[in-house]
């Protein structure tokens, strides 16, 4: 998707580079110097700097547009908590509920090995 957004930039940059190479091949300086109406001309170095500045400005503009689109897409996504209905999750929720409850239930409650450490134990680990 990002490649499709950069393809117009690639086309424009290729055309600009082609034009810059074409301007170097054609002796335009002699025609510009011969016309008295053209007082301001750019040297080759100034033309290259101007072209580089234009390309850099265009790239910065496209990057800003992409960032704004990504921020707009990112803000529309809402975070949702995953619901877990497996036996493990239900057991964890019940153990949490029992541990938080007070009164007589807490006095008679013997804690079981419920948690990440309890699962996957072998029998020899439990007997030791």
Curated annotation (Swiss-Prot):
Stretch forming the signal peptide: 1-25
GO cellular component: axon; cytoplasm; extracellular region; extracellular space; hippocampal mossy fiber to CA3 synapse; neuron projection; neuronal cell body; neuronal dense core vesicle
Pro-sequence residue ranges: 26-80, 125-128
Pfam families membership: Calc_CGRP_IAPP
Keyword Secreted attributed: yes
Keyword NAD: no
The entry's keywords: Amidation, Cleavage on pair of basic residues, Disulfide bond, Hormone, Secreted, Signal
Modified residues (Phenylalanine amide): 119
Main localisation: secreted
Bilayer-crossing regions: none
Localisation per UniProt entry: Secreted
Gene Ontology molecular function: any one: calcitonin receptor binding
Disulfide bonds: 84-89
One of the GO BP terms on file: positive regulation of cytosolic calcium ion concentration
Family recorded in the similarity comment: Belongs to the calcitonin family.
Name of this protein: Calcitonin gene-related peptide 1
Source organism of this protein record: Rattus norvegicus (Rat)
Lineage of the species this protein comes from: Eukaryota, Metazoa, Chordata, Craniata, Vertebrata
């Amino acid at each position: 998707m990002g490649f499709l957004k950069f393809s117009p930039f690639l086309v424009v940059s290729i055309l600009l580079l082609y034009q810059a190479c074409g301007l170097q091949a054609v002796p335009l300086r002699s025609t510009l110097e011969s016309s008295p109406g053209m007082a301001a001309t750019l040297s080759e170095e100034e033309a290259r700097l101007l072209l580089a500045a234009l390309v850099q400005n265009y790239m910065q503009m496209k990057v800003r547009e992409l960032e704004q689109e990504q921020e707009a897409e990112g803000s529309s996504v809402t975070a949702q908590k995953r619901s877990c209905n497996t036996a493990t999750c239900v057991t964890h929720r019940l153990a949490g509920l029992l541990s938080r409850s007070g009164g007589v239930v807490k006095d008679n409650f013997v804690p079981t090995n419920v948690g990440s450490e309890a699962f996957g134990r072998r029998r020899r680990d439990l007997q030791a």
